[in-house]
Amino acid sequence: FSEEGELALCLEKRGEAPDEYSGISDFVIDGENIIILDRNQQKTITYDHSGNSISTFHLKYYAQAISPIVNNTFFLYNGFDTSHKLHRIKNWKEDSAFLEVDKNQTGYLFIFAHHNFYQDHDSIYFFQPINDTIYKSVEGGNMNPFLHIDFKGKNIPTSFFSDKKYENVKDFFDNLNKRSYAYGIYSFIRDKRFTMFGSFYQKNKKLTLFDHKNKSSNTFGTIKDDVYFKGLTIPISQFIYHANKDGSIVVPLEAYSVVEWRNTYTPSEPFGSIINTTKEDDNPLLLIFDFKQ
């Protein structure tokens, strides 16, 4: 869809043929091209905006996320499938690998996330659910440590990973939730004024907003809507957002939630006409906004 809500393309190429995908693990739009990552078939497929297949790039590992493309370069995140977590693809050739995998963690730290990459102009940021460090690549260069998140002494200590051998993801989180550790970096976004990301503390999802100008940060568990439904409070656990490279943020609102909310809260203008005609089985409404600078 365009940002005006107009349908741009409906792509349906599911299958096992060379120009088909078994599922969409991730995708990225690069100008006139749409690049789809098919984890199960270990490949990426590039289509044009008419849905025609342009090329297929085969992988030797199971990748779960693809980064935006900068300078004909992108990164693939494969979790713990190879000796390194990140692979750099430059001009459609394997170029380098980054972030060596700790073999002691391969059995329990393979965790999926909505996002692992964020683009800000010519920079690509990489982040993971169980990692306090955010990495950065500029103009397709090496992926280097950029930020370390300090959860005010609540970070998971290194000893937590080394002192006990966990059987699986459930065993790891059962032990983690017995302690008051903060962890995760979800949906990281950064512009000239703010850095924002999600995390977990005591089983609850939180959102942190850091103001570069004032050198201050706030962490909160709810968002008060003063745009669509004034007075509506949304738990962070229900607040899923996607970051555009221009710094804007897209929040999908499920149609059934909008219908439920309008029975209690009066929709604000100029959104009232859209909200009042929304049906429960409609596509999600997309709220696009920018940070106040």
Per-region residue spans from a language model:
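Repeated scaffold domains used in trafficking and secretory/extracellular systems
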Residues: 22-26, 61-69, 107-116, 182-187, ...
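Asp-box/WD-like beta-propeller blade repeats and closely related beta-sheet repeat scaffolds
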Residues: 19-24, 37-84, 97-109
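Conserved blade-ending motifs and adjacent loop-strand segments that build the rim/top face
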Residues: 146-173, 177, 213-245, 259
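Structural motif
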Residues: 42-45, 81-88, 131-136, 203-209, ...
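Blade-loop segments of beta-propeller domains
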Residues: 1-32
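Loop-centered beta-sheet repeat module
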Residues: 91-143
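Short beta-strand elements that form the blades of beta-propeller/WD-repeat-like
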Residues: 29-38, 71-79, 85, 116-135, ...
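Short coil/turn segments at the loop-to-beta-strand junctions that recur within blades
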Residues: 12-19, 58-65, 101-106, 149-155, ...
